[in-house]
């Protein structure tokens, strides 16, 4: 598959295979096209050439580097309730607490939370969806050390496949069983 913009490839063609247990780290310095690869895999950008296909039974969850909340003038409880209307308030509070969003943090407007707290809410929402593939673009952005450790602990317990873009080698090397280096 070739990736790029406006019909121009930004990388040489890439190719890799995964199975249901692959935890793949897309490794490379900033600006080489790792996010572009993920966006192309997710069909948010067209491939310049070739294609990437998933098994028909794939259930994919994707967290982008740039967080997108439809309405940032709601709190975490409301966001989760709108995203998962069948979840009880108690279950929402329990799930938010697991990612460190407790008490008053759960009722503050998302726009008033730190970047790390917003990441935690997105991760909490992501973890509620049934999936067998996680695609994560810099999931540790804005997280403190304890939150990073909790995230990677949860990812290690995840039984599906993972495609990870991260500049956190300490965590990525422990988590991933396959590395794909992006180089020019």
Where would I find each of the regions flagged by the language model?
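ABC ATP-binding cassette signature C-motif
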Residues: 1-184
